[in-house]
């Protein structure tokens, strides 16, 4: 009898450890995918600044044409889309399973900073998905021929960003992205075990600067384009 109880306990403990390892591996993957997407955003924001060049869009349209015709870039687009979708799926899976694993009647008067940040990530992530649909309708789906629009993306950007409500929507989008990146930057280091009391504050400050620079780059294009005469 004692042996059976011991065996049952061992199996439960082993199963719990496997589930814990499985959950941790997902968190690590979410962190790595988030880091990859953050690097892409820096590239995307830098490329968008070309819209502000005083050349009638020649350089920016040449860049867009290269991005749309190069097979290596096309393959990268698939990888990027896959990384984005996987990042979303795993984040939602972790949020749901963590909530389900919480005992009924569980109550914690003072929520930790990590818990609040994680909850913020989920909600800002959902808002980002909604905003990206707007962005895809304005640009990416036009490139794919799924919706009508100007294939001269320099002119398309000017036409869209000079509409007040669209410009405001994009600026709000960048604010949401800022909050998501601001927490996500530090969360990557925490998940990978690289965050500690000695470097934690510096990591958070760098994350704020990184998120601010990227979002300001995006916002600058929208604001200046909005103020320009088409």
Which residues fall in each region the model found?
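Membrane-embedded alpha-helical bundles that constitute the cytochrome b-like, heme-associated redox core
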Residues: 2-230
